């Protein structure tokens, strides 16, 4: 989840769904908020996601920090169902999730994936998901 901390408080910016390989970031899904929520709803309750974003906005105290931040979460298997680990880490900076949100479509066009690769230098690419 991506947020912004301002003098007026914390504002939810959007959901960021990303891929990892061996624990390292590899890319984000570029889709509307609704499409990402539908995808997450296959695994965890959307009410739970809403509660997490509301609790972060209402109760997280970042002291004097003002700016973008990301809350990394993880969906894990547990006893035949999926569970949400609601706070793996908090990144007090603009994250790749913020970049993905700025590139995400406004309508339900074809899903895309933003990926970072490295072969002598970093390369950002966007491709169709299917």
Enumerate the predicted regions with their spans.
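ATP-dependent carboxylate/phosphate-activation module, predominantly the ATP-grasp catalytic core
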Residues: 1-55, 91-118
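A long amphipathic alpha-helix within ATP-dependent nucleotide-binding catalytic cores
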Residues: 25-82, 121-129
